[in-house]
Amino acid sequence: MIAVKKDKINGDALGTGRRKSSVARVRVRPGSGKITINGKSIEEYFVNDQHRYAITETLEAAGLTESVDLLIRVSGGGMTGQAGAVRMGLARALCSHDEALHDPMREGSFLTRDSRMKERKKPGLRGARRGVQFSKR
């Protein structure tokens, strides 16, 4: 069971998603299917089709493509991390919006946090794992 988060003023459903170093805050309200990310449309913000699909796939799984508006604020990381953060935040917000969507979101693994993070650079190495080239002579 996920905690239901609603805006106290206008009743919007809220959800927060994280992926790598990206954080997305998603607000779902009844509407016509308009998606706004950091003040831009989804086509302007996510140029890559795969990034856009990560978001629209969540709406399609819920069956709410044309019936809700999304206001999204996302920061940190790159485009792939941000798309993943928005995907998870949207799934959480949709579960707050309608409790019946929890099972389809869980089955589609939209609510599963991707825990993979960048591995830190180790001392004495050039990167996280890459060492200095070995010379026998």
From Swiss-Prot:
Which stretches does the entry tag as region Disordered?
114-137
Tell me if Ribonucleoprotein is a UniProt keyword of this record: yes
Cellular component terms per the entry's GO annotation: cytosolic small ribosomal subunit
For whether the record's keyword set contains Glycosyltransferase, the answer is: no
Q: Which UniProt keywords apply?
A: Ribonucleoprotein, Ribosomal protein
Detail the disulphide connectivity of this chain as listed in its UniProt entry.
none
PANTHER family annotated for this entry?
RIBOSOMAL PROTEIN S9 (PTHR21569), SMALL RIBOSOMAL SUBUNIT PROTEIN US9M (PTHR21569:SF1)
Its family remark reads: Belongs to the universal ribosomal protein uS9 family.
This chain belongs to the protein called Small ribosomal subunit protein uS9
